[in-house]
Regions:
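Short glycine-/small-residue-rich Rossmann-like dinucleotide-binding loops
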Residues: 98-99, 123, 250, 256-258, ...
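Conserved beta-strand positions in the Rossmann-like core of class I SAM-dependent methyltransferases
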Residues: 72, 219, 287
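Residue-level detector of alpha-helix initiation sites
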Residues: 124-127, 142, 146, 202
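Rossmann-like dinucleotide/phosphate-binding beta-alpha-beta segment
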Residues: 26, 166, 181-276, 296, ...
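Alpha-helix C-terminal capping/helix-to-coil transition sites in glycosyltransferase folds
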Residues: 89-90, 114, 247-248, 273-276, ...
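Rossmann-like dinucleotide-binding domain for NAD(H)/NADP(H)
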Residues: 140, 277-392
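Phosphate-binding beta-alpha-beta segment of Rossmann-like dinucleotide-binding domains, i.e.
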Residues: 136-138, 143-194, 206-209, 213, ...
């Protein structure tokens, strides 16, 4: 019998929903890159339910208790007296989501003597210190691809919102105003602009595809160049380095994983290379940007706006400057946990657990660290530096 420790975000302030705004969600079985959606043997939830909060339990309790395991669910994850720390020493499996991550740094991984599997319900496993996971022989897995489109839709929404000045204009409408000039003095069309992505994996590529019909000029920087066919189909300009790309872009969207190479990539020096009046949308990871350099750039007017849904730490403190800096279009970390996205990554979490308990290999796409090294998607998307230490 194993102890499974699951860290989820708190329920809504008015309690766990009894009804939902919609009765069903579209059933997506194959992603646009041909990867099939998760294929667990069974699920104990209805797609479209809230699964990522504490009472939702990722729909796993019936399954795990049916196998005789102990299943602990909590949102209390910070500090030495937290529920999370209390159960850490004897948990065999730890499950959390990027939106409310159970940070597993070197100290916590050293304490987690029985830990065998760190499972991310969602995409992005940088809340786990991968070097330490490698050292301790912990398998790290995530549900690659499950919510890529969820995130890319959010990013496209944010690009349009910033450029067209949607949020301030909406606020005028709510306040009873009809201040057309106030609304439009920062409102532009995206048509004809130069839009570039940092990384062109599933999310970056999906954003490029969705932006193409807006008749913009598309640019990208990536570690692995796309095929000639893809470049021609989307009319993409490839850049060998980020500096060259940002010089020509009106909008930069960040879609890279966080690892030593991308940490603080958008610092004072990089932002200075951008056009005055450019916009940044970051739905990847907060630490790819230098927090205070972003604040200074929007305050000085060098950036016309910054939007994203990722923060450091998560949850972000109430006084985090990105909440109140001018021309921000921030949301809490929600893009990948739409009810549509969470239906898929929850099914994927179930698939990974079924494989684990039945001794079958986990889908290659879902593996980040295995057998003491980067593997699967991890080997493609992440780097680890031998002497690099993360601080959370």
């Amino acid at each position: 019998m194993a102890k499974i420790l699951c860290v989820l975000y708190p329920d809504p302030v008015n309690g766990y929903p009894k009804t939902y705004a919609r009765d069903e969600i579209p059933n997506i079985t194959v992603y646009d890159n041909g990867q099939t959606a998760p294929t667990p043997k069974a699920i104990d939830f209805k797609p479209g339910e809230l699964l990522g909060s504490v009472s939702g339990e990722l729909g796993l309790r019936k399954y795990l208790e049916g196998l005789g395991h102990e299943f602990i669910v909590t949102s209390d994850k910070e500090g030495p007296d937290s529920e999370f720390e209390k159960h850490l020493p004897d948990a065999e499996i730890i499950i959390s989501q990027p939106f409310w991550p159970a940070y597993l740094g070197p100290e916590r991984l050293a304490k987690a003597k029985k830990l065998k599997l760190a499972l991310t319900a969602g995409i992005g496993s940088d809340h786990v210190d991968l070097e330490s996971a490698i050292k301790h022989g912990v398998t790290v897995a995530e549900v690659t691809g499950s919510n890529s489109i969820s995130v890319s839709e959010h990013a496209v929404m944010m690009i349009l919102s910033l450029v067209r000045n949607y949020i301030p204009a909406h606020e005028w409408a709510e306040k009873g105003g009809w201040n057309i000039a106030d609304c439009v003095e920062r409102s532009y069309d995206v048509e004809g602009m130069h839009v570039g992505t940092v990384a062109a994996g599933r999310i970056g590529l999906a954003i490029l595809k969705r932006m193409k019909p807006f008749d913009v000029h598309l640019h990208y920087y990536a570690r692995h160049r796309l095929s000639k066919e893809e470049e021609e189909e989307l009319g993409l300009t490839f850049h060998e380095n980020v500096e060259d790309m940002v010089k020509v872009c009106d909008v930069v969207t960040i879609n890279a994983p966080l690892h030593p190479e991308t940490h603080h990539m958008f610092d004072e020096a990089m932002i200075k290379k951008m056009k005055r009046g450019a916009y940044i949308v970051n739905t990847a990871r907060a630490e790819i940007c230098d927090r205070d350099a972003i604040v200074r750039a929007v305050e000085s007017g060098h950036l016309a706006g910054y939007a994203g849904d990722v923060w450091n730490p998560q949850p972000a403190p109430a006084d985090h400057p990105w909440r109140t800096m001018p021309w921000n279009g921030m949301t809490p970390h929600m893009s990948g946990t739409s009810l549509s996205g969470q239906a898929r990554y929850t099914a994927g979490t179930r698939e990974i657990l079924e494989c684990w308990f039945e001794g079958r290999p986990i889908r290659e796409d879902y593996v980040i660290v295995d057998g003491g090294k980067l593997a699967g998607t991890g080997a493609l998307s992440y780097t680890v530096l031998e002497h690099h230490h993360h601080h959370h």
